[in-house]
Amino acid sequence: MLLGLTGYYEQWEKDFARAYRFRLPIIMEEGGLPGAHHRYWIDPSGKYREGHSEDVRLGEYEESRNAHVNMMDLRIGDEVASWFNTSFDLVKRFEREGGYRLYPTKVSFVNKARSGEQVSVQHNWRNLGWGYCPTNIPQWKGKYKVCIALMDTHHNIVKKQLVDEADLSTWVQGHDGHYTTTVKLDGLQKGSYTWLIGLVDTTKACQPGLKMAVDKNLLFEGWCKVGKLKINK
């Protein structure tokens, strides 16, 4: 969508974006190239000064936030130069705020159990970004899922439990995910294990497929380490 220029991005387009919000990813298209023929300084909003492309970039950013976009469209040389030379602070800000930023806000689990026992893990998820994780589109349908796992002291993943009811595309600002998952501890030997949680790619042996917005010190090969489990025979 041609964001930023109010003479192009009018109410009907805003309504269109609103109708498809969190149903399909929305891409931010630039609103005025400094070296092109867009005379952005005559925009009806009166916000933009001639020779100040950073004014347009800020307008684009604000409209992108309102439209809950998933991606910035940086593809034309003069436009990219404008973003990086005059408005790089907004590019960095989009890295923190835009798209989807998924992480587990709370994970509750047992730390002692017996082999073969069934235990419950409660986990809550939040999206910090404006956009959404588009697992509802045909290309990604069923591809990425929440998974709870156990790792032994040799760093081997010995147990995985998919959370099929968790729909990542529904985690949007103001709407967290809350789940309780049963994990059967069959086949586990006596010893110590580490609880892990992650967003896995079901087409690649349920290995971590999406990065979480989690401190890297808490991660092991894409999994988030959440606690310890001791198995007693």
PLM segments and residue spans:
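Generic, low-specificity signal for short hydrophobic/alpha-helical stretches with a mild N-terminal bias
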Residues: 54, 86-89, 140, 179
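Extracellular/luminal regions of secreted and cell-surface proteins that mediate adhesion/ECM remodeling
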Residues: 95-233
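Catalytic cores of secreted or luminal carbohydrate-active enzymes
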Residues: 56-110
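Catalytic-core regions of glycoside hydrolase
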Residues: 1-78
